[in-house]
Amino acid sequence: MEQQKALDLSFFEQSTIEVAKGLIGMHLVHELDGVTLIGRITETEAYLGVLDRACHSYGRRRTKRTAILYEEAGRCYTYTMHTHCLLNVVCEQKGQPEAVLIRAIEPISGVKEMERLRGKPHTSREFANGPGKLTKAMGITMADYGRLLTEPPLYFAKGDHTNASIVATKRIGIKGAGPCSHHPWRFIDGNSRAVSAYRP
């Protein structure tokens, strides 16, 4: 497979909603121990900062964990939930703490290594159809926190966005976010089976 072309920093400086939609069909690439792992992104969620009750920076909260959200766009925001590492990319301008959560991928390249990391065959619908599943398959850990995701070894690259049928739905698992839980800020490729089990 030819060398992947990383997305420019300007891509992540767009509105967070546009980034979340625009990443559907793009590639997530991890050059790990001599193997290039590539997954096609099929599901994302947008988190819109200080006014979004579901966002870690709601009300301008700032902790050691969330500090990276206030930095430049394109940075990696990883955190753990129920022992799983979740991958987010920081968006907008510095000081505007918004991010996109990567929720699911389809394996494209480096599949054998991804299967080894995940402990499951890539043909399984459950292989990477969730944020904790995809980080395990891609070898992404908390050590990647703060990394700039526009250059190797971990980055986003141009894929085939035009083949995606983008569907917007409510986000998953944020019932405590009040009215914000109803915003259609989750985006999936309606043509893909590799998305979270929840559908509207």
From Swiss-Prot:
Enzyme class (EC, first level): hydrolase
InterPro entries: Formyl_transferase-like_C_sf, MPG, MPG_sf
KW Mitochondrion (keyword) present: no
UniProt keyword annotations, A-Z: DNA damage, DNA repair, Hydrolase
Any one Gene Ontology BP term: base-excision repair
Pfam assignment, any one: Pur_DNA_glyco
Gene Ontology molecular functions: alkylbase DNA N-glycosylase activity; DNA binding
The keyword Electron transport is annotated on this UniProt entry: no
EC number, UniProt record: 3.2.2.-
Family: Belongs to the DNA glycosylase MPG family.
HAMAP family associated with the record: 3MGH
Family matches, as NCBIfam families: 3mg, PRK00802.1-2
Descriptive protein name: Putative 3-methyladenine DNA glycosylase
Source species of the chain: Shouchella clausii (strain KSM-K16) (Alkalihalobacillus clausii)
